[in-house]
């Protein structure tokens, strides 16, 4: 926040849902030295009543979380990330870079359209009556056409479950009618 000559261009956004693994808790903050940004943010904030009480109460409790918790969570997510990235990059035609600060990756898949592939996986493909889900990444891009064959894949499952999900994904990619390789 104190970068010389850039203080008017820096916005810090944080949330308890990300910092404390409180998925769905809509409690967070926005900080900036830019008065126009803060005035616009306040207009939105004042138009809303408040986050749900349960999320507020959980957030208060989360503030007392010991540092050791974060070290354990970080180590676990690094393990999950490395497992996921290695597994994806071993699949024919799949590429994903190593994320450095998220719990998901954006993977390039050998498919004609990830929206169609994701729907096909959910509606048609099964192994032992199970499937896996990917999130089409096109909506994360502003440029039209970007991300059409990319998927956002979270590594929030434990490694044993991810292993199964990766196997299902790999077999689904092999069987998908819109495969491009």
What would you call each of these model-derived segments?
Residues 1-181:
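PLP-dependent class I/II
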